[in-house]
Swiss-Prot record:
Residue positions where Sulfotyrosine is found in the record: 4
Tissues expressed in: Expressed by the skin dorsal glands.
Protein family membership: Belongs to the gastrin/cholecystokinin family.
Positions bearing Phenylalanine amide: 11
Protein name, UniProt field: Caerulein-4.1/4.1Y4
Keywords associated with the record: Amidation, Amphibian defense peptide, Hypotensive agent, Pyrrolidone carboxylic acid, Secreted, Sulfation
Protein function: Hypotensive neuropeptide.
Subcellular location(s) per record: Secreted
Location of Pyrrolidone carboxylic acid modifications: 1
Record bears the keyword rRNA-binding: no
PTM text: Isoform 4.1Y4 differs from isoform 4.1 in not being sulfated.
Length: 11
């Protein structure tokens, strides 16, 4: 399971 905010912090 992969977390979007954990792997891709582009906000």
């Amino acid at each position: 399971q992969q977390d979007y905010t954990g792997s891709h912090m582009d906000f």
